[in-house]
Amino acid sequence: MVTVEEVRRAQRAEGPATVLAIGTATPANCVDQSTYPDYYFRITNSEHMTELKEKFKRMCDKSNIKRRYMHLTEEILKENPAMCEYMAPSLDARQDIVVVEVPRLGKEAAQKAIKEWGQPKSKITHLVFCTTSGVDMPGADYQLTKLLGLRPSVKRFMMYQQGCFAGGTVLRMAKDLAENNAGARVLVVCSEITAVTFRGPADTHLDSLVGQALFGDGAAAVIVGSDPVVGVERPLFQIVTAAQTLLPDSHGAIDGHLREVGLTFHLLKDVPGLISKNIEKSLKEAFDPLGISDWNSVFWIAHPGGPAILDQVEEKLGLKPEKLRSTRQVLSEYGNMSSACVLFILDEMRKSSAKEGMSTTGEGLDWGVLFGFGPGLTVETVVLHSVPLN
């Protein structure tokens, strides 16, 4: 007769959770940031709000974003005029879009990750799906399982309404699943569509306007597993530790509420200050056990909430400009895609490291940090170890 302890030991993997593949996807519709203010005020019938339009132009100019991708085209918005008003009942129309498009875009990213992984999708044992775009039952995890043709026995977990920190959350969860289930291969998908938050401008709520200047659509997928099969699976990053914390005195700094008018977004001005003031504590807790205290000696993947957050973090920690290069590159090319952002940055970093002939997937460095920031304020801190590049 076997003991519970023997069963438990047999269930555990030996090595650390490892990112084995990454895939990303965006809608076809690309929006140029320089012309977006004119388009946005025209499509929302707000061109008479000239002062507010000038403010919005300045927001877009300061965003450090060149382009974004959005499922919402002019044609779709003209068919759904309530979505173009500031506070018109429009949840049904938004839901009709996101319940279809969130899994569909997630499928596109997942297929790319599965192709890079090079293994049959029947080997996927777990699915973690995350979106802040709408809710449904059965969820986007179920829809994706059907779209991809995954096994009916795949163990699914659906995360709705988490916000921008959740790219770190899904890696933390994937780490626990992979390391506690020998042979597990976890498909992680973050898929975000701004159809749930798009709305016209209002001079009484500039925080909503900030969201309209920053947010874009995108989906990213990673496959995570422990003990990679040598010669068959190619490791990209090891997930070493993962932690979550609530920042002190930050209640109400970022929040969102699902209403008849869609998902409303609220942001306090001191968010960059709250994050930069507290970030070193999270870093020390993560890296003290490793004997690392030089923040320029690690590679950086930070959720790019907006340029002000990145600038203040950089200044507070004395980071060299190149430390946030991959982060700023993704912000520039895609905007803020909520939970998907950090996975896009992970992809950008491993690709640029290989392209530039660096010795590891982490810009030639061994250790790195992935940060997610979002409603709460919640901070996810994930310590990564890079993999040598041949």
Curated annotation (Swiss-Prot):
Q: What pathway does the annotation place this protein in?
A: Secondary metabolite biosynthesis; flavonoid biosynthesis
| GO BP terms | flavonoid biosynthetic process; polyketide biosynthetic process
Q: Which reaction does it catalyse?
A: (E)-4-coumaroyl-CoA + 3 malonyl-CoA + 3 H(+) = 2',4,4',6'-tetrahydroxychalcone + 3 CO2 + 4 CoA
Enumerate the InterPro entries for this protein.
Chalcone/stilbene_synt_C (IPR012328), Chalcone/stilbene_synt_N (IPR001099), Chalcone/stilbene_synthase_AS (IPR018088), Polyketide_synthase_type-III (IPR011141), Thiolase-like (IPR016039)
Query: A single GO molecular function, which one?
Result: naringenin-chalcone synthase activity
Indicate whether Transferase appears among the record's keywords.
yes
Keywords for the protein's UniProt record, in alphabetical order: Acyltransferase, Flavonoid biosynthesis, Transferase
EC class (word):
transferase
Give the positions the UniProt entry annotates as the active site. Answer: C164
Q: Which family does it belong to?
A: Belongs to the thiolase-like superfamily. Chalcone/stilbene synthases family.
Against PANTHER family, the record matches this protein to: CHALCONE SYNTHASE 1 (PTHR11877:SF80), HYDROXYMETHYLGLUTARYL-COA SYNTHASE (PTHR11877)
Briefly state the protein's biological role: The primary product of this enzyme is 4,2',4',6'-tetrahydroxychalcone (also termed naringenin-chalcone or chalcone) which can under specific conditions spontaneously isomerize into naringenin.
Report the protein name in the record. Chalcone synthase
Q: Which organism is it from?
A: Antirrhinum majus (Garden snapdragon)
